[in-house]
Amino acid sequence: MQDVENITPYGTDSRDKAEQVREMFDAIAPAYDFMNRAMTFGIDRLWRRKAVKMLASAHHDEILDIATGTGDLAIRMAGTLDPLSVVGVDLSEEMIEIGRRKVSDAKLNEVVTLGIGDCLLLPFPDSTFDAVTCAYGVRNFADIEAGYREMHRVLRPGGTVLIIELSTPQSSVVRPFYNFYTRTVIPTIGRIVSKDVRAYSYLPESIAAVPQGDAMCALLSAAGFDAPRAIPLTFGTCTIYIAKKNISQRKTDSY
């Protein structure tokens, strides 16, 4: 199986993955929220709600949401967890612009700030945030382990990292239906709704290739996180990964 880091939205295009991902999300931004609801029958909202509930066991004053997209997770965290601030970063200006409008509509401008940012080079000092999250974005990283190291760097000792990522069901009963849906139905809907024909073919390819379960937990451990856990949801079609930064970790842990 090809490494997910080598799977790009536009295949043989010579540009690096980050550039292709930015172009893809700029193109599909107007249809992105609708497609998320349609593809998951609205279950993506339940997955985010579950993730935020897992964070609620401790108070987090400052939260970073990486690959924030149109801000769904950032907005839910701001409205539920009562943080002082939620910062969301994303490569796509078009996605961020839609997210800013949603933040304004939710009257959360004083709590949520969205801006352009690269997960591999986060513009924040060491040990800045109490929690770092990323929903459905890890598949798009050009280097997953480097992205996790950056998350670890900007997280305060004792802080939490939480990842939501799409995954492949392990059940031999569920998997054939899932494969048909992701490889045939979703790309067809994408071609009808979105300007970008390739984007929704890239989706099942990247899901199939992204590290899952124990393999993803191993990457979190390699980046320095403690006790990573994988929590499968909805027959294993989505997985939440959660881990901690060691409380004794020195503040200056630059890589």
For each predicted feature, which ranges?
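Hydrophobic beta-strand segment of the Class I
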Residues: 32, 132-133
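Core SAM-dependent methyltransferase catalytic element
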Residues: 226-255
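C-terminal alpha-helical "lid/dimerization" subdomain adjacent to the S-adenosyl-L-methionine
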Residues: 164-223, 229
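A short acidic, Gly/Pro-enriched loop at the edge of an enzyme's catalytic core
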Residues: 120-131
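Class I SAM-dependent methyltransferase SAM/SAH-binding core
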Residues: 62-121
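N-terminal auxiliary segments of SAM/dcSAM-dependent transferases
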Residues: 1-23
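A short glycine-rich, Lys/Arg-flanked "PGG" loop and its adjoining helix->strand segment in the class I
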Residues: 145-160
